[in-house]
């Protein structure tokens, strides 16, 4: 935090952060689409889920509207249950695992093991996560209209501490989740206290195998339909950054950088170096930074030409 965040601002101005945020949403899009492409019934159920969420978002008010993702999922699950368990149109929902799961159980913990080669392979990912975290903060700033720059250092430190804590008990590295940004965009709830409460509740539910089994019963087409909405909103958040910062996409440098970044992210372009593979979000992030540095140019104010009045 002592070295500040100005260097990040220079590397990732609004035109870059907007492109990265949009690339994140486009990179996640195939995951949602593939999860609902197993059959025609799954695809139509995904459409029904999108409609349920959309109807809740537009035609409800108050608390129901703020919980539109949850309410939309519940309505879509009920429709899925009627169509499958009652009408037999698709794969029925099976609650056997829920009935056999225990109410309380401890997760599996393991002590960390240090491997130099593995550490060298995973260390560069931290740089990607810094850029991705910055993009997430910019997206939140664009949605809320608040300057989040003073909190960047805290966000990076918190991200690092969370990863260290997770690794100390055998967990994987953690980062901020772009899906939550989409939920914020839909619900218009930006309070940090809400996310603290959600984190505590999530940790407590992690000790309940029955809840985990219940989550597994949510049909894949319903999850996929909700993901289409959420991932799309992430992409829109990137465009919102451009609009609010008045990014000039008529400049060829900006245009080329944005075009390449979006294709790298949407196409999940990967680069492999030895045993390390940089995925689509990483290549899009680094591509945006490098292209912006190479193609951007400072606009110099050119004084208007002097008008010379000639004597008749």
PLM ranges: what are they?
Residues 4-7, 112, 186:
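Juxtamembrane loop-transmembrane helix junctions in multi-pass integral membrane proteins
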Residues 89-108, 142-145, 155, 294-312:
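Intrinsically disordered, low-complexity non-transmembrane regions of multi-pass membrane transporters
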Residues 76-97, 188:
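Alpha-helical transmembrane segments of integral membrane proteins, especially early/N-terminal helices
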Residues 121-192, 307-311:
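Membrane-embedded helical hairpins/re-entrant loop segments and their flanking transmembrane helices
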């Amino acid at each position: 935090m002592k070295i500040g965040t100005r260097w990040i601002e220079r590397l990732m101005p609004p035109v870059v952060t907007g492109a990265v945020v949009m690339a994140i949403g486009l990179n996640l899009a195939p995951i949602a689409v593939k999860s609902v492409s197993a059959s025609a019934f799954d695809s139509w159920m995904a459409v029904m889920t999108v409609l349920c969420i959309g109807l809740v978002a537009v035609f409800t008010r108050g608390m129901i509207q703020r919980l539109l993702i949850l309410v939309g999922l519940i309505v879509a699950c009920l429709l899925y249950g009627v169509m499958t368990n009652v009408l037999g149109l698709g794969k029925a929902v099976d609650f056997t695992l829920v009935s056999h799961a225990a109410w309380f159980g401890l997760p599996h913990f393991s002590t960390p093991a240090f491997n130099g080669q593995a550490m060298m392979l995973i260390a560069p990912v931290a740089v990607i996560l810094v850029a991705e975290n910055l993009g997430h903060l910019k997206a939140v700033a664009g949605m809320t209209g608040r300057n989040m720059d003073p909190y960047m250092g805290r966000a990076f430190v918190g991200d690092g501490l969370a990863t260290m804590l997770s690794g100390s008990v055998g967990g994987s590295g953690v980062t901020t989740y772009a899906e939550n940004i989409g939920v914020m965009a839909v619900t218009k709830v930006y309070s940090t206290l809400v996310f603290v409460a959600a984190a505590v509740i999530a940790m407590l539910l992690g000790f309940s195998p029955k809840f985990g089994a219940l989550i597994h019963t949510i049909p894949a087409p319903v999850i996929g339909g909700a993901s289409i909405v959420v991932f799309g909103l992430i992409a829109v958040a990137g465009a919102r950054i451009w609009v609010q910062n008045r990014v000039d996409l008529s400049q060829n440098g900006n245009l080329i950088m944005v075009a390449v970044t979006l294709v790298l992210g949407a196409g999940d372009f990967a680069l492999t170096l030895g045993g390390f593979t940089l995925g689509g979000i990483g290549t899009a992030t680094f591509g945006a930074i490098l292209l912006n540095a190479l193609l951007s140019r400072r606009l110099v104010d050119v004084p208007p030409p002097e008008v010379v009045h000639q004597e008749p």
